[in-house]
């Protein structure tokens, strides 16, 4: 008699799934954490809502209205979720038939697009970016048949560059009437002039992902947004769980999106950009650094001699970076979050001491 294990009972695609390796899952015993693109210091908030005996609103009014005003869109064009990661998944659940439809994304890029699709049983198609990490529009066009959702991260994680806006327009024309194009703008606060939020009126099939995890310094809050036309938002509302935001999360998010909160965020962004330029300049002078790539974000991608040895050496010193060696076209690359000046100096000093 054959014995069926619990794992045997699981769906085949889940048994075969490689989970996303978040910075926290990868662990490490560091005191300089530069591997998750977080803001380096905590921002203080006081809870004002004490109604924890009641279920929260599905889409808290203050959060939606404040974000709509900040993003320059209408409240009915905003959906709030448990981080932008939930937004990624909601779009697949709303638009893709498992076993029939596909998503498409362009590596090297953020890893959750594929994990979300594979979890649901939706095919993943990839079209690697060109040498300058811009979109291969011909390659995308050739693979669009059967694709319902296209994910494009801009600025792109982990490479740090913006996608050419004319290429975005071409992609939106290629997909009109065929697929949803998702612009992942998790890092847009560091280059707000590049946002596509003003394009929603032109493109009914455009969706934009946003988060409070980066420039708003609230990675621990797990609060993200999808901006899209009302027809898209209404479909996402059909598949979102009934209470995506807890009362404390909604309380703090509304405060972070107040006029004072927006000013504080802008000041943080200016400080991070100053620190980023300091770190880029220093990295370019270090012998073990072969190449430093331009960045529009709060992190820097660089290519190193003996990158695995450098990564481990810094890890052993409590400086935790993000190894990008396994990503397509990123051999020898490490990603460094921009932290405080003290953290930057720790990285610079450690790299200068490397004998490779």
UniProtKB/Swiss-Prot annotation:
* One GO-annotated biological process of the protein: L-histidine biosynthetic process
Q: Which cofactor does it need?
A: pyridoxal 5'-phosphate
Which residues get modified to N6-(pyridoxal phosphate)lysine?
214
Note the InterPro entries from the entry: Aminotrans_II_pyridoxalP_BS, Aminotransferase_I/II_large, HisP_aminotrans, PyrdxlP-dep_Trfase, PyrdxlP-dep_Trfase_major, PyrdxlP-dep_Trfase_small
Q: Name one GO molecular function term.
A: histidinol-phosphate transaminase activity
Give the enzyme's EC designation. Answer: 2.6.1.9
Metabolic or biological pathway, per its Swiss-Prot or TrEMBL entry: Amino-acid biosynthesis; L-histidine biosynthesis; L-histidine from 5-phospho-alpha-D-ribose 1-diphosphate: step 7/9
Q: Which SUPFAM superfamilies match?
A: PLP-dependent transferases (SSF53383)
Q: So what does this thing catalyse? A: L-histidinol phosphate + 2-oxoglutarate = 3-(imidazol-4-yl)-2-oxopropyl phosphate + L-glutamate
In terms of domain of life, where is this protein from?
Answer: Bacteria
The record's comment on protein family reads:
Belongs to the class-II pyridoxal-phosphate-dependent aminotransferase family. Histidinol-phosphate aminotransferase subfamily.
Q: What's the subunit arrangement here?
A: Homodimer.
Q: What is this protein called?
A: Histidinol-phosphate aminotransferase
List the source organism.
Shigella flexneri
């Amino acid at each position: 008699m054959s014995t069926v294990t619990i794992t045997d009972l699981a769906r085949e695609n889940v048994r075969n799934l490689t989970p996303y390796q978040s910075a926290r899952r990868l662990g490490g015993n560091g005191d300089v954490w530069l591997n998750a693109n977080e803001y380096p210091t905590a921002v203080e908030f006081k809870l004002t809502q004490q109604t924890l005996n009641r279920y929260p609103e599905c889409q808290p009014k203050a959060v939606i209205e404040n974000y709509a005003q900040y993003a320059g869109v209408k409240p009915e064009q905003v959906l709030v979720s448990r981080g932008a990661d939930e937004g990624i998944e909601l779009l697949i659940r709303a638009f893709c038939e498992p076993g029939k439809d596909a998503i498409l994304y362009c590596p090297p890029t953020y890893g959750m697009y594929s994990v979300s699709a594979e979890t649901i049983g939706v095919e993943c198609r990839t079209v690697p970016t060109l040498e300058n990490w811009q979109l291969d529009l011909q390659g995308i066009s050739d693979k669009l048949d059967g694709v319902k959702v296209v994910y494009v991260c801009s600025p792109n994680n982990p490479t740090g560059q913006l996608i050419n806006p004319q290429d975005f327009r071409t992609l939106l024309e290629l997909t009109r009437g065929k697929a949803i194009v998702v612009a992942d703008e998790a890092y847009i606060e560091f280059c707000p002039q590049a946002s596509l939020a003003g394009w929603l009126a032109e493109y009914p099939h455009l969706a934009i992902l946003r988060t409070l995890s980066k420039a708003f310094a609230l990675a621990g809050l797990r609060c993200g947004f999808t901006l899209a036309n009302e027809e898209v938002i209404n479909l996402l509302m059909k598949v979102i769980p009934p209470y995506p935001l807890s009362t404390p999360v909604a309380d703090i998010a509304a405060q972070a999106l107040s006029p004072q909160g927006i000013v504080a965020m802008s000041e943080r962004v200016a400080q991070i950009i100053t620190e980023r330029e300091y770190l880029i300049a220093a990295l370019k002078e270090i012998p073990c650094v072969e190449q430093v790539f331009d960045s529009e974000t709060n992190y820097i991608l660089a290519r190193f001699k003996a990158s695995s040895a450098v990564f481990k050496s810094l890890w052993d010193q409590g400086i935790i970076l993000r190894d990008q060696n396994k990503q397509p076209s990123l051999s020898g690359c490490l990603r460094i979050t921009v932290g405080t000046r003290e953290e930057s100096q720790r990285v610079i000093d450690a790299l200068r001491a490397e004998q490779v």
